[in-house]
Design a protein with these regions (language model features):
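Short alpha-helix plus adjacent loop in nuclease-associated cores
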Residues: 109-128
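A charged helix-plus-loop insertion that forms the helical arch/lid used to bind
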Residues: 103-115, 188-191
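Active-site core segments that coordinate phosphate-bearing ligands/cofactors
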Residues: 2-5, 11-12, 24, 124-136, ...
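Enzymes and membrane/adaptor proteins characterized by extended Gly/Ser/Thr/Asp/Glu-rich
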Residues: 177-186
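N-terminal glycine/serine-rich phosphate-binding loop of ATP-dependent small-molecule kinases
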Residues: 1-106, 134, 160, 215, ...
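Core-facing hydrophobic residues within beta-strands of well-ordered domains
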Residues: 84, 211-213, 415
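Glycine-rich beta-strand-to-loop/alpha-helix junction loops that act as flexible
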Residues: 90-94, 219-220, 269-272, 417-425
């Protein structure tokens, strides 16, 4: 195989809610090849670990540890490929860093922090949910940035801050010293007006961030050059550019989802399940708001009309709980793959759970809470772990199928197929049951869709790559294995 003439590799920093990674991507024989260089853990940390006076329930991200891991990963990447031309960053949405005179104020708070729920009534006393949806087109979620900022107004640091940067923009700032806000992620904050594509001045003023938001840039724009001191640390040239990826991880994932056509839905399945369709214009109807859908911005001016639903969080939290028990009892670790294999042999459960139930929002004791929900619904709590996993899988598949059809209906077309990407696309039982319940084919893959989208946007932005990566999805189809699942009929409960 030969590398494309004149094409340099790029580095993608892909930060997820449970893990992060640094990946090298390059074009080889017209296909994108990804090399995982560094993977590291991520997750919520009690704020009290950083601030002894904080509430015991308050949650944060260890952003300094993430930055340390990113630097380590980039050093490894440049050791492997000194000719890396650019770096791009994507991450989860809504969370932010506050800065004053170039110094971060406190920690980056976690979107699952319970303070957000308490702030909802205060903001809605000024703007109704219907009015907010008309402005920003977003599904109501208590962790949206606007509610976090309303909660922040009760604390000192927002008034002291002179800059607010969303997580990927903060990492870009650390890399370049340039403060910019990439627009796919800006659209998740609730502060961006869907009709104008600019900051909503009234909301911005009401929430105390006037003059604190960075200029908006678009995917593929240059953020700036890598800082000289970091270039020396990584062994990189001074010409390395930091390029704005579609910095909301879902936007990067959707950019790399090889949709079959305009009547396709996508499910970006990780900790969250982002179920939606790609449209040219936002859907700002009462029906869309009532159904809980959101309008987020995507690559090349597209609209990601989608609904945030629970994804594999219920599975990972259940396994985490069981492994805590196993450690206390000096027993072997529980492996999700083993439980999924056992679950596939079990019948369709009689009683399902609602994965969107607020009882499942916070981490901790997940199997206990699932069992309680099943009892409350009139069912019998599962006796074994595999049985509980089977209930979760069936519940997720039912949720995915229903929301994919609803997205298509509200978008004005009949659903023809579903593409599942991300880590959840590896779950054979989940993909098959989604196809069965939706009664349409499911195409699974790619797994590393977010990193792939990040890489493709960067490659397209480079002068030598502009004509080679014009159709991102065609490149994806050439580059990865996709698995098809045909619906086989809805099985009746045993």
């Amino acid at each position: 195989m030969s590398r494309n003439q004149g094409q340099h590799p790029v580095a993608a920093i892909d930060l997820g809610a449970t893990s992060g990674r640094v990946v090298i991507g390059e074009l080889v024989d017209g296909k994108v090849e990804l090399t995982l260089v560094h993977r590291f853990a991520n997750g919520p940390v009690p704020l009290v670990e950083f601030d002894s006076g904080a509430s015991a329930q308050a949650l944060a991200w260890d952003i300094d540890e993430l930055w340390s891991q990113i630097r380590q990963g980039l050093q490894m990447a440049f050791e492997l490929r000194p000719d890396i031309a650019s770096i791009g960053v994507d991450s989860w949405a809504v969370d932010y860093a506050l800065l004053k005179e170039g110094q971060r104020l406190g920690q980056v708070r976690h979107y699952r922090d319970p303070r957000n729920e308490l702030a909802v009534p205060d903001l809605e006393a000024k703007f109704s949910r219907a009015e907010l949806f008309e402005r920003n087109g977003l599904q109501f979620l208590a962790f949206n940035t606007i509610y976090q900022l309303q909660a922040e107004k009760q604390e000192q640091r927002l008034g002291e801050a002179d800059q607010l940067l969303l997580v990927p923009d903060y990492i870009n700032w650390l890399l370049t010293g340039q403060a910019r806000c990439e627009w796919t992620n800006a659209s998740t904050t609730g502060l961006l007006n869907q009709r104008s594509g600019t900051w909503d001045e009234e909301l911005v003023g009401q929430l105390g961030v006037a003059g604190k938001l960075a200029p908006i840039i678009h995917p593929g724009d240059s953020v700036g050059s890598l800082l000289p001191e970091l270039a020396r640390e990584f062994g990189a040239s001074n010409s390395v550019q930091v390029v704005a990826a579609a910095s909301h991880d879902t936007a990067s994932a959707v950019a790399a989802t090889p949709l079959a056509g305009k009547n396709s839905a996508y499910i970006s399945c990780g900790t969250w399940g982002l179920v939606g369709v790609e449209l040219a214009e936002p859907v700002l109807t009462e029906q869309a708001q009532a159904a809980g859908f959101t309008n987020e911005l995507g690559l090349d001016g597209s609209v990601r009309f989608l609904k945030n639903v629970t994804g594999t969080f219920l599975l990972s939290e259940s396994v985490s709980y069981w492994n805590q028990q196993a450690a206390q009892a000096s027993e072997p670790e529980v492996q999700l793959a083993d439980l999924l294999a056992q679950a596939a042999r079990l019948p369709v459960p009689l009683v399902l759970i609602d994965p969107q139930d607020e009882a499942f929002l916070a981490p901790g004791r997940m199997p206990v809470r699932i069992s309680e929900a099943i009892n409350k619904a009139g069912g019998t709590a599962p006796e074994g772990r595999a049985e509980l996993i089977r209930i979760v899988i069936e519940s997720l598949a039912a949720s995915f199928a229903a929301q994919a059809h609803e997205a298509a209906r509200l978008g004005g077309f009949d659903l023809e197929d579903i593409h599942i990407v991300g880590g959840g696309s590896q779950g054979e039982l989940l993909c098959q049951r989604t196809a069965d319940l939706a009664r349409v084919p499911v195409v699974a893959g790619p797994v590393e869709c977010t990193a792939l989208g990040n890489v493709l946007v960067q490659l397209r932005s480079l002068p030598q790559g502009a004509d080679q990566v014009d159709d991102l999805r065609a490149v994806v189809r050439r580059s990865v294995f996709l698995r098809d699942y045909q619906p086989v009929g809805v099985l009746k409960p045993a």
